[in-house]
Amino acid sequence: MFMVNLLTMIVPILLAVAFLTLIERKVLGYMQLRKGPNVVGPYGLLQPMADALKLFIKEPLRPLTSSPSMFIIAPILALTLALTMWIPLPMPHPLINMNLAVLFMLAMSSLAVYSILWSGWASNSKYALIGAMRAVAQTISYEVTLAIILLSVLLLSGSFSLSTLITTQEHTWLMLSSWPLAMMWFISTLAETNRAPFDLTEGESELVSGFNVEYAGGPFALFFMAEYANIIMMNTLTAILFTGAFHNPLMPELYTINLIIKALLLTVFFLWIRASYPRFRYDQLMHLLWKNFLPLTLALCMWHVAMPITMAGIPPQT
């Protein structure tokens, strides 16, 4: 039975990934005053299927000087970890209800760094290695602020379980009360998922395509799917953390629809940012984090720790 549950979670995620590629191309197309894909199927709806078919029937080429086992393991690991991170997300019921769901997600996103590092190293190409090293430095750096922001949110929620956040936000969204945290979280998720304007790892003008430059066909498709699954997962997590969806225990389906709509709007916002902003310079990217976000998030975290202790002696003012 558990396998059936697992499949009912994985298949919709992969379908969402397929159609996100189409939405991205359509949104970018309309923002550049053109149509986007509109040939395969009605309004280009079958384009993702055609893309998947094209990628998976291509011969998976492998550079002669590459490290074969690691070269193959990296994309598989990337997709596996991207799908594993969906397990504790409440929709409104998670696949496995963990006590330390947030910690589990942080650990999984840290492990995803290894797949990037291995792919860059195993390709035995200078471009891939430089792209991988950039991606690893960027991902590890921005995880620091993500963890501190999560800690601040959990201090407000009072539990490491994500399901508690539904109850916490019954009266008001955390996005309204903790908007600086929400803002920094959103920008950090952009950097964490290597999206524009932080897509330094795949700077086409410098690194061709970044750490996956030597990949073709199936393995490349796995990396691609992992990246987009991470984008949808991060936006769903943002929706859970900061814009708590309305949850009526008698109608759990309403919560799911609400959550999906919010995650979709956030994802379209990701694409809007991609269409609007130029790429950051690498040193600016690191300065933004270490000199702006980190001091701010640490100060806010200490504020959230100190306030309940400071206010504990004051009687209720109602």
Swiss-Prot record:
Record keyword Nucleus present: no
Protein name: NADH-ubiquinone oxidoreductase chain 1
Location in the cell: Mitochondrion inner membrane
Species: Pteropus vampyrus (Large flying fox)
Main location: mitochondrion
Top-level class of the enzyme under EC nomenclature: translocase
Family according to the record: Belongs to the complex I subunit 1 family.
Superkingdom to which the source organism belongs: Eukaryota
A single Gene Ontology CC term: mitochondrial inner membrane
Membrane topology annotation: Multi-pass membrane protein
Task performed by this protein: Core subunit of the mitochondrial membrane respiratory chain NADH dehydrogenase (Complex I) that is believed to belong to the minimal assembly required for catalysis. Complex I functions in the transfer of electrons from NADH to the respiratory chain. The immediate electron acceptor for the enzyme is believed to be ubiquinone.
Disulfide bond positions: none
The protein's Enzyme Commission number: 7.1.1.2
Transmembrane segments: 3-23, 70-90, 100-120, 146-166, 171-191, 222-242, 253-273, 294-314
Listed GO biological process terms: aerobic respiration
Lineage: Eukaryota, Metazoa, Chordata, Craniata, Vertebrata
One example GO MF annotation: NADH dehydrogenase (ubiquinone) activity
Keywords: Electron transport, Membrane, Mitochondrion, Mitochondrion inner membrane, NAD, Respiratory chain, Translocase, Transmembrane, Transmembrane helix, Transport, Ubiquinone
Catalyses which reaction(s): a ubiquinone + NADH + 5 H(+)(in) = a ubiquinol + NAD(+) + 4 H(+)(out)
